[in-house]
């Protein structure tokens, strides 16, 4: 099954809403419409930027989409600081990232919570980008495939086969995030294939064949082509490089098969 590549730019805690507008305008200017026929491009800004991004995307009829960096497992109520999927849907979000390693590490989020957040995203019409990935000690011990498969199972617990078939999975080895270290294309393919095989067990091979599995971890315009060229890697969750409109547009164009804009 042919899967359209997805390039998702995770801005993390960077850029106020004025800077967000400037960056989206830069991406839109640098990446002509023709590329969007071959690659889906989305930005994942901080919550405070979403309304500004929505206004720009809707007003200029841009083809890029946007999403949120997290979503609450709760619909509404006395949950100070939480953001409901219903709010994100009203803002026109397409995606919600859940289970990013920084949420798992700094906010003690476990697989059960990640699965609950993924379910909440689906409930409100959002597509969850479900993140998994191993630490360096697991990689060096040679247990990375088993670790990621187990984390995948836990992070999808309770979802229906149809929901699993509609999710996006992002493999981000923790040791490669923001470090400049990048898993080789072969390393990325090894884990992403194991992810797809397990999705086949959890849902069905037919549904698994349609799931987009992304790689994340120090992705840039120099390495994205080889990574996305792997059989089971369908795009990238991009961190630092997504804050540079020119570089983000370039790597999106590369994922689309070129030529460079």
Swiss-Prot record:
Location(s), subcellular: Cytoplasm
Active site: 100 (electrophile), 172 (proton acceptor)
Organism: Mycolicibacterium vanbaalenii (strain DSM 7251 / JCM 13017 / BCRC 16820 / KCTC 9966 / NRRL B-24157 / PYR-1)
Keyword terms of this UniProt record: Cytoplasm, Gluconeogenesis, Glycolysis, Isomerase
Residues engaged in binding substrate: 10-12, 178, 218, 239-240
Family matches, as Pfam families: TIM
Superkingdom per UniProt: Bacteria
Pathway: Carbohydrate biosynthesis; gluconeogenesis; Carbohydrate degradation; glycolysis; D-glyceraldehyde 3-phosphate from glycerone phosphate: step 1/1
Gene name of the encoded protein: tpiA
Enzyme category, top tier: isomerase
Taxonomic classification: Bacteria, Bacillati, Actinomycetota, Actinomycetes, Mycobacteriales
CDD domains per record: TIM
GO annotation terms (biological process): gluconeogenesis; glyceraldehyde-3-phosphate biosynthetic process; glycerol catabolic process; glycolytic process
Name of the protein: Triosephosphate isomerase
Gene Ontology molecular function, alphabetical: triose-phosphate isomerase activity
Primary location group: cytoplasm
Reaction equations catalysed: D-glyceraldehyde 3-phosphate = dihydroxyacetone phosphate
Chain's role: Involved in the gluconeogenesis. Catalyzes stereospecifically the conversion of dihydroxyacetone phosphate (DHAP) to D-glyceraldehyde-3-phosphate (G3P).
Family: Belongs to the triosephosphate isomerase family.
Known partners and oligomeric status: Homodimer.
GO cellular component: cytosol
InterPro entries xref list: Aldolase_TIM, TIM_sf, TrioseP_Isoase_bac/euk, Triosephosphate_isomerase, Triosephosphate_isomerase_AS
This enzyme's EC code(s): 5.3.1.1
């Amino acid at each position: 099954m042919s899967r359209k590549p997805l390039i998702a730019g995770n801005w993390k805690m960077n850029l106020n809403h004025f800077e967000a507008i400037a960056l989206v305008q830069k991406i839109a200017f640098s990446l002509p419409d023709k590329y969007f026929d071959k690659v889906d491009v989305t930005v994942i800004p901080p919550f405070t930027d979403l309304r500004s991004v929505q206004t720009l995307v809707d007003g200029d009829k841009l083809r890029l989409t946007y999403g949120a960096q997290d979503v609450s497992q709760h619909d509404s109520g006395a949950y100070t600081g939480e953001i409901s999927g219903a709010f994100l849907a009203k803002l026109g979000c397409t995606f919600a990232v859940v289970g990013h390693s920084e949420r798992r590490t700094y906010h003690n989020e476990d697989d059960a919570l990640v699965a609950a957040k993924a379910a909440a995203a689906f409930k409100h019409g959002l597509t969850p980008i479900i993140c998994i990935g191993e630490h360096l000690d697991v990689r060096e011990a040679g247990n990375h495939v088993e670790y990621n498969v187990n984390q995948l199972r836990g992070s999808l617990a309770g979802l229906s086969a149809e929901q699993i078939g509609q999710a996006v999975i992002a493999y981000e080895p923790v040791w490669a995030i923001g470090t400049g270290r990048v898993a080789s294309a072969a390393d990325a393919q090894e884990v992403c294939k194991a992810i797809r095989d397990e999705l086949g067990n959890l849902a069905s091979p037919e549904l698994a064949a349609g799931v987009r599995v992304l790689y994340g971890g120090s992705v840039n315009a120099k390495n994205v082509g080889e990574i996305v060229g792997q059989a089971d890697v369908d795009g990238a969750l991009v961190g630092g490089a997504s804050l540079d409109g020119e570089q983000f547009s370039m790597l999106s164009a590369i994922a689309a098969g070129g030529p460079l804009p």
